[in-house]
């Protein structure tokens, strides 16, 4: 299965768009939800979680375009790769001329479950305005033998210990906000 998706939204003044994105199971995923912040005080958020197993490439991320003043955006991307799977983050944050006092935060974290899996990060930031706040952070970590040893010494089997580590890594998804009514 090839999962090639285009998702776009525009936000006018005071509006908020929240993408919650999950990617699992397809051989190839290429998905980058986009938010165009066209009105003052609009906000875009993306929370993306991807799991890449054997023979899979999950290429996910987000695009935020700040086209008005006082806009804000947040991208949180979590990926897990195992069995030789490949997880990639590909994102764009663009602040156009005139979008002063805009702010953006990008955080992408990857967890490699074994030594044959791979993670890549391709961030792109294009700022054309002086008075903005921009932050980008990326981490790639590996499940350590110490983590597994600790949990196994507490009576867990290896599969159960690994599952607990992965669940802890993606715990941000369980604390995502509920829809506002």
Question: At which residue positions do the language-model features occur?
Answer:
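Conserved beta-strand/loop scaffold segments within soluble protein domains that form the structured core
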Residues: 1-156, 170-172, 180-181
């Amino acid at each position: 299965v090839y999962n090639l998706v285009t998702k776009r939204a525009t936000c006018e003044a005071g509006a908020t768009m929240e993408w919650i994105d999950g990617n699992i199971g397809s051989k190839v995923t290429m998905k980058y939800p986009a938010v165009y912040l066209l009105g003052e005080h609009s906000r875009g958020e993306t929370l993306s979680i991807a799991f890449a197993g054997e023979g899979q490439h999950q290429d996910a991320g987000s695009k935020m375009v700040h086209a008005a003043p006082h806009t804000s955006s947040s991208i949180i991307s979590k990926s897990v790769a195992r069995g030789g799977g490949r997880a990639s983050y590909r994102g764009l944050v663009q602040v156009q001329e005139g979008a002063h006092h805009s702010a953006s935060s990008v955080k992408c974290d990857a967890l490699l479950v074994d030594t044959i899996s791979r993670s890549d990060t391709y961030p792109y930031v294009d700022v054309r305005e002086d008075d903005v706040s921009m932050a980008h952070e990326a981490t790639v970590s590996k499940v350590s033998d110490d983590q597994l040893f600790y949990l196994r010494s507490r009576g867990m089997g290896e599969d159960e210990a690994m599952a607990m580590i992965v669940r802890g890594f993606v715990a941000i998804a369980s604390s995502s906000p509920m829809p506002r009514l």
